[in-house]
Curated annotation (Swiss-Prot):
Mg(2+) 2 binds at E29, H144. Pfam families: DHBP_synthase, GTP_cyclohydro2. D-ribulose 5-phosphate binds at R28, E29, D33, R141, A142, G143, H144, T145, E165. Residues 205-363 are annotated as: GTP cyclohydrolase II-like. Its EC number is 4.1.99.12. The keyword Membrane does not apply. The gene is ribB. Mg(2+) 1 binds at E29. It is an enzyme of class 4 (lyase). This is 3,4-dihydroxy-2-butanone 4-phosphate synthase.
Amino acid sequence: MSHISPIPEILADIKAGKMVIITDAEDRENEGDLLMAAQFVTPEAINFMIKHARGLVCLPMDGEMVEKLGLPMMTQKNGAQYGTNFTVSIEAAHGITTGISAADRALTIQTAVSPTAKPEDIVQPGHIFPLRAQKGGVLVRAGHTEAGVDLAQMNGLIPASVICEIINDDGTMARMPELMKFAEEHKLKIGTIADLIEYRSRTESLLEDMGNAPVQTPWGEFQQHVYVDKLSGETHLALVKGTPAADTETLVRVHEPFSVMDFIQANPRHSWSLPKALEHIQQAESGVVILLHRTEDGASLLDRTLPKGANQAYKWDSKSYGIGAQILAGLNVKKLRVLGQPSSFTGLTGFGLEVVGFEEAEK
């Protein structure tokens, strides 16, 4: 796709203070955002975004910046489809009028991302919407929020960006054909989150591989691989049957969270129990069961056993998404046949993974 610029070119434009267009996967939001490093924002840049892109002007920031400003999350129960972490909206405490003009919004952003910014420098609510990026960036969550922080951080800039969705004249979201025309008209480069994931994956990993050894289970022998999460310090396991090959399908079960409740099989939201998944994969030529550890509090443990949970769809934890993908990529798994109900797994392209089908558990 010649209209897609390689990540080094995208990085160069970001470092030069230019805007770029960043797209996500077609099976995710399937949108393109204007994006620039926040420290270079100007009233003219904001005006261009609101005039030509027409979306919501947001301010992706890393967690430390959000905490330094004392910004609470917009809601304690995030029900957004893709888990975007909105904080409360903000305004510069001084130097603005209504807060909505391009100049006022630019000043608010400049104030918030200043290295000397303090909580008293901003007020809430306002006309700028900060977004808290996941630690680990696009290797953890394949979103525009994380891409914005990554692209700034990789250039040694302040870890914050300004983004705005691109909307067509008729109010619909701009897809790739329209984005290509937009880029050509305004002389902007287009980059993809998938390419950014692939670029970072070549030189970075969020996991430390602690080694592997055979392990006997009631369902037969597996090769146990142990990984330590560099961000959380938690330990994740992969139980591998056979030798996964890149050109053949591999049965995959990603079990998350893996906790004491699995030993008594008190997990009605998982269509495949851990024993059932291990038994099924042991009968296949190759397969992988990933056990992602995440500390659970008492409330979440009880919630697993409540009757109301039985009919609720299991919501994938975005913080674990990239971890599972990195484990699979490292095991040479490319084509996944997932043990579970059909669902959308976004952002896998950058890890070189493809879901070819699903297998639901028998009732």
